[in-house]
């Protein structure tokens, strides 16, 4: 799991890129006088030419070469969509009058009856002022070309038109998929169909249909009817509906790959057939999320007889050459608890459960081969004894993908493409299948990487919200898998994505239309605008953090603001751009000044407008603190702008007062994050620049001076770089912290020192600690804050070292000092010192309320640093504000 700090760093990098690098590695675009194109994914080769092909009721399609019903239906859809978007009635069919403006479609061959992985998807497109010509070797290429034509539609003062253009296009990867989980929350037919339409518009070509899980079995099975009768709550697809979806997908150039997850994630199978399980029943449908113990018994022949019959029936239903067996997250607890299974492992000389699962997979591979299918599964299925036509789907990352390719196996990447993590489109866009270890593969090995899949797992979605969690961000994944590896410009991607987002409405996707309806649900008869003002600048908390904040089950209502909020805020991204331009316009700072002030005033005043509605709505009461926080942030932003415009440095006391606003709770009950916060942080830190701002991502620590240099280094921790104390120190003559590293060029009086700290000592050590050293004079004269796992007279204190053993100067009793360093996580800290009053305050996690306080004027100034008494640990995201001592 990627750490929060890494995500924060990446988000800031995205925001920097959006403003400072808008034209770096972008898709090439039009010259002056010609329209900007918004194609997504961007074609392999494209050139704009003078001229425009006007759209009117005479626009018509003619065929040359191969024709088939699938192409005729595609043309009907094309005409229908074009007519909807322009309001111009267009005639269906392909019979044309010579006076009509033609779209000539040249299809060379019929293609395969069942679309294959390596089927030719290329096409060429030539649009001139008199006609358009689309050529493709197969119907699939024609389908892609028609989608490109629809994206070329523009409007000017004379009406609708398509710009004159030459396009030669083909995908970089042949496998470009979207996984839809219909088990954890049921998804009706109409959800699947409209998302297939969205997939077609972005040239995604594989629907990975996750059809069985602990929480549900979703396909009618004639051979074993208790699978769907007892394992689905009545929510399953009939065979006829499955065939309808497969045909619907084929009409759009999309393969359908079913996934029936085995041997784990199989609780729903066992409700009707407990004899398949490794532990005795009875079983019931699982309502909780997570990794569960039930799994199939891989030692019993009856299990394979059952699966042989099952696979045979499903192989007849699903025509694709691949059959996904899942194979992930088998914890093996029920295997270890079964004496017969343990005896089987011993008899077969199996070292562990991985060997046992490999045996199971080999047996399943034989069954699949018998029924004409090739195996695909998650990382866990990989074993050197498997046939080379097996495809491994990697959720672990490029390293795992590269290893698979080196061993001669084909693979697809999903790590980094999990849409249910509600990360920005730019995050997914920068996940490159041929990066990391995969970049070092030979050309032959690289061909084994077939592509990737975006994943939409269904723990926290419903039919009402699924579209908003897939679109438009899935288009960023689609472009990464289709377009040239050199097309990487984030700013240009967002420019095109915003237009593409609007066009998705024509496909009846609900990602935009359901948003105002869900907000209206919260406010009843009241105006929705104040709530929308707030909702537009928040996003759901990232990754799967929701499950660590409250208990969710399959029956939990998904009717809170976190469910309505969009995964990515357009308003926040636009606001960040405006702030960046404002700050770059030095020294006058006139750019966007009035617009920024207007937006900040609206957010500041919004809470008063919304307050009465929040108090009256049960569904909104939890977000009162969120609304208050936004108002306070906006006020701080306005104050920061005033300091910046007047060219005045903000007082240190003001900075101390607003900094808590920049540290929202890490796991808020409302499960939302305020995404205008980074832009307002920029304003605040410009109003009073920190003396030091260090995240160690450059791999350097040149500003730091350790007392024992060999004990300190910059290293990776949880996927991010930080400053690590790797060896504990030894006590000297004076009892005091033994290891520290100081900011060497800063001698300050008043100070604010913030960052994150992580102790690496075992959790059962009651004296585990990290310290903040300040007003350091020499090794036996300084203050320190001791953050510890326990509280007593000398632990979890503010201490003074004045030429002798340290003494406690903090006012809190041992019972009242609130020791919190009790886990292996990073924790926020803040230490402040007021040189005029001698007041010292130490904060831990909660930046509003200090856990330790003291008053002392022994040392009025000195250096600042981090360290420990006798532990190891890590520090990150260090910032220092202060007054330089004269």
What are the language-model segments listed below?
Residues 39-42, 46-49, 57, 125, ...:
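Substrate-binding groove of N-acetylhexosamine-processing glycoside hydrolases
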Residues 731-802:
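Secretory/extracellular carbohydrate-interaction modules
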Residues 803-828:
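Short, aromatic/His-centered strand-loop micro-motif at the edge of beta-sheets
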Residues 851-877:
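Flexible glycan-contacting loops in extracellular carbohydrate-active proteins
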């Amino acid at each position: 799991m990627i750490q929060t700090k890494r995500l924060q760093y990446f988000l800031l990098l995205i925001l920097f890129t959006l403003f400072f690098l808008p034209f770096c590695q972008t898709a090439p675009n039009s010259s002056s006088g010609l329209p900007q194109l918004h194609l997504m994914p961007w074609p392999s080769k494209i050139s704009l030419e003078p001229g425009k092909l006007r759209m009117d009721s005479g626009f018509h399609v003619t065929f040359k070469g191969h024709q088939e019903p699938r192409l005729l239906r595609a043309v009907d859809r094309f005409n229908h969509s074009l007519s909807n978007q322009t309001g111009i009635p267009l005639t269906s069919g392909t019979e044309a009058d010579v006076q009509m403006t033609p779209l000539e479609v040249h299809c060379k061959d019929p293609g395969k009856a069942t679309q294959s992985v390596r089927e030719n998807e290329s096409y060429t497109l030539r649009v001139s002022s008199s006609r358009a010509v689309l050529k493709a070797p197969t119907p699939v290429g024609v389908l892609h070309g028609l989608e490109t034509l629809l994206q070329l539609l523009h409007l000017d003062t004379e009406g609708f038109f398509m710009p004159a253009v030459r396009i030669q296009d083909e995908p970089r990867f042949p496998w470009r998929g979207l996984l839809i989980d219909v088990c954890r929350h049921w998804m009706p037919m109409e959800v699947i169909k409209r998302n297939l339409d969205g997939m077609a518009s972005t040239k995604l070509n594989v629907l990975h249909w996750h059809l069985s899980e602990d929480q549900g079995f979703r396909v009618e099975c004639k051979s074993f009817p208790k699978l769907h009768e007892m394992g689905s709550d009545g929510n399953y697809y009939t065979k006829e509906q499955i065939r309808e979806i497969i045909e619907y997908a084929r009409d759009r150039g999309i393969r359908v790959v079913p996934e029936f997850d085995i041997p784990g994630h199989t609780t729903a199978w066992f409700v009707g057939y407990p004899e398949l399980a490794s532990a005795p029943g009875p079983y019931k449908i699982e309502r909780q999320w997570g990794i569960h113990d039930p799994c199939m018994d891989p030692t019993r022949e009856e299990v394979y007889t059952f699966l042989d019959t099952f696979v045979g029936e499903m192989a007849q239903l699903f025509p694709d050459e691949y059959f996904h067996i899942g194979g992930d997250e088998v914890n093996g607890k029920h295997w270890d608890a079964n004496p017969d299974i343990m005896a089987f492992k011993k008899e077969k000389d199996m070292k562990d459960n991985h060997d046992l699962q490999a045996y199971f997979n080999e047996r399943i591979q034989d069954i699949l081969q018998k029924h004409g299918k090739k195996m695909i599964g998650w990382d866990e299925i990989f074993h050197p004894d498997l046939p080379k036509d097996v495809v491994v789907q990697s959720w672990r990352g490029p390293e795992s993908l590269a290893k698979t390719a080196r061993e001669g196996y084909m693979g697809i990447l999903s790590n980094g493409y999990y849409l249910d993590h509600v990360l920005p489109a730019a995050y997914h866009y920068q996940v490159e299948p041929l990066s990391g270890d995969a970049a070092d593969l030979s050309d032959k090995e690289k061909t084994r990487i077939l592509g990737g899949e975006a994943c939409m797992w269904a723990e926290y979605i419903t039919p009402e919200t699924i579209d908003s969690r897939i679109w438009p961000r899935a288009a960023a994944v689609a472009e990464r898998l289709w377009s040239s590896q050199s097309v990487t410009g984030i700013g240009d991607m967002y420019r095109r994505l915003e237009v593409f987002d609007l066009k998705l409405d024509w496909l009846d996707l609900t990602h935009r239309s359901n948003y105002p309806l869900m907000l209206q649900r919260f406010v009843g008869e009241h105006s929705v605008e104040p709530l929308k003002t707030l909702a537009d600048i928040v996003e759901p908390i990232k990754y799967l953090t929701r499950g660590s904040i409250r208990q969710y089950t399959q029956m939990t209502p998904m009717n809170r603001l976190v469910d309505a909020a969009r995964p990515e805020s357009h308003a926040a991204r636009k606001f960040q751009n405006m702030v960046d331009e404002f700050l770059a316009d030095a020294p006058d700072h006139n750019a966007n000044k009035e617009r920024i002030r207007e937006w900040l005033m609206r957010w500041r005043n919004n809470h008063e407008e919304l307050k009465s509605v929040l108090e009256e709505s049960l569904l909104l009461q939890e977000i009162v603190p969120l609304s208050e926080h936004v108002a306070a942030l906006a006020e701080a932003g306005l104050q920061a702008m005033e300091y910046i415009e007047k060219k005045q440095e903000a007082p240190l006391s003001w900075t101390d007062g607003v900094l808590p606003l920049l540290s929202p709770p890490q796991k808020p009950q409302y499960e939302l994050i305020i995404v205008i916060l980074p832009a307002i942080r920029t304003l605040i830190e410009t109003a009073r620049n920190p003396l030091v701002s260090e995240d160690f991502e450059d791999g350097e620590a040149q500003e730091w001076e350790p007392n024992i240099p060999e004990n300190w280094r910059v290293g990776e921790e949880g996927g991010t770089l930080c400053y690590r104390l790797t060896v504990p120190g030894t006590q000297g003559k004076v009892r005091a912290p033994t290891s520290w590293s100081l900011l060497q060029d800063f001698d300050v009086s008043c100070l604010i020192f913030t960052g994150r700290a992580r102790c690496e000592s075992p959790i059962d050590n009651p004296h585990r600690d990290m310290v903040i050293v300040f007003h350091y004079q020499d090794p036996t004269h300084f203050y320190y804050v001791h953050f510890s796992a326990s509280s007593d007279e000398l632990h979890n204190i503010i201490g003074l070292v004045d030429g002798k053993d340290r003494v406690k100067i903090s006012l809190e009793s041992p019972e009242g000092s609130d020791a919190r360093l009790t886990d292996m996580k990073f924790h926020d800290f803040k230490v402040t010192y007021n040189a005029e009053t001698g007041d010292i305050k130490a904060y831990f996690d909660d930046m509003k309320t200090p856990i330790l306080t003291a008053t002392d004027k022994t040392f009025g100034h000195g250096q600042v640093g981090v360290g420990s008494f006798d532990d190891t640990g890590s520090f990150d995201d260090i910032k220092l504000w202060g007054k330089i001592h004269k």
